[in-house]
């Protein structure tokens, strides 16, 4: 993109970008490339595409805010309190005063919570900010269900809830307070893959009385997730067994149907596989939309059969591609 912009725009051009939609890792090289071409990269206050959609009465979809659930220690092998203690130890090693977690899977992992805001992904739209004395979840309207709060309190986490939209203002406030109360020794840790908007907020929007360091590197949660404990490993093994049973039962059913002369469409096959998976213990849902490609359809990347109109039947002499997955506790 930077090559196209520098080749097609004249010197002195200003390129506007919504900082919520681009990571710091993407922003920095783009800014450098434009600067070399005597151009400017500017963060726009409001997303211009969204503004246009409002004017055209084609409203952007609302952000989902489905219920969240807690995953007990028999599945995770570690309480959220243990995980947060380890993160605070890492923070102390780097002498940081706040850790900002922006990746949705990392928030879910840290708190042992799961959601369903994104299809086929057990995550929920949120941010998590950890300090030596507080744990704040920016989620939905900030009203965390009491049962979730009680469970986390039992695990040693006094979770505070704040509205999702308040994250940038909250980070700016934290940055300014750390700057005013220190002498350059305070810092905030956040991943380079966080949005440019989050980085700007954590920098106090450039309005700090004293220096504030930003530790912009891989999140410690990402590293913690790499090392699986014994409970997680055994969970993986058992999930593979259960899912394998469902898939074997499905193929046995499919062969029986076709050998017996019963017509089976791609859609019917996908639905039957889901039925078998639902019968397995701890099944939570598919991990992506099943791809049941019969014959020539098996060559189509990310194929998805239509439920409307004619249905492709799976014939006895067809090559049949089945790409599917399940998620379990």
Predicted regions and their residues:
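Active-site neighborhoods and metal-handling regions in enzymes and metal-associated proteins
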Residues: 1-329
């Amino acid at each position: 993109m930077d090559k196209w912009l520098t080749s097609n725009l004249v010197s002195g051009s200003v390129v506007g970008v919504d900082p919520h939609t681009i990571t710091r890792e993407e922003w920095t090289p783009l800014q450098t490339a434009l600067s070399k071409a005597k151009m400017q990269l500017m963060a726009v206050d409001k997303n211009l595409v969204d503004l246009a959609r409002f004017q055209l009465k084609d409203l952007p979809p609302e952000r989902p805010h489905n219920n969240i659930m807690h995953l007990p220690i028999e599945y995770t092998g570690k309480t959220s309190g243990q995980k947060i203690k380890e993160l605070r130890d890492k923070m102390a090693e780097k002498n940081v005063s706040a850790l900002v977690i922006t990746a949705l899977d990392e928030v879910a992992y840290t708190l042992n919570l799961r959601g369903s805001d994104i299809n086929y992904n057990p995550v929920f739209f949120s941010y998590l900010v950890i300090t030596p004395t507080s744990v704040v979840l920016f989620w939905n309207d900030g009203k965390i269900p009491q049962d979730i709060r009680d469970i986390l309190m039992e695990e040693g986490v006094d979770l505070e809830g704040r509205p999702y939209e308040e994250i940038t203002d909250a980070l700016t406030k934290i940055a300014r307070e750390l700057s005013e109360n220190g002498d350059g020794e305070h810092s905030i840790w956040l991943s380079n893959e966080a949005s440019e908007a989050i980085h700007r907020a954590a920098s106090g929007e450039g309005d700090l009385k004293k220096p504030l360091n930003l530790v912009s590197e891989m999140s410690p949660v990402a590293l913690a997730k790499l090392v699986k404990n014994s409970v997680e490993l055994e969970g993986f093994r058992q999930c593979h067994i259960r899912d394998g049973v469902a898939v074997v039962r499905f193929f046995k059913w499919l062969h029986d149907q076709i050998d017996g002369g019963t017509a089976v469409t791609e859609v019917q096959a996908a639905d039957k596989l889901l039925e078998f998976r639902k019968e397995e213990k701890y099944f939570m849902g598919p991990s992506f939309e099943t791809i049941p490609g019969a014959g020539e359809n098996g060559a189509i990347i990310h194929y998805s059969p239509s439920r409307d109109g004619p249905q492709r039947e799976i014939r006895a002499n067809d090559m049949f591609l089945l790409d599917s997955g399940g998620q379990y506790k």
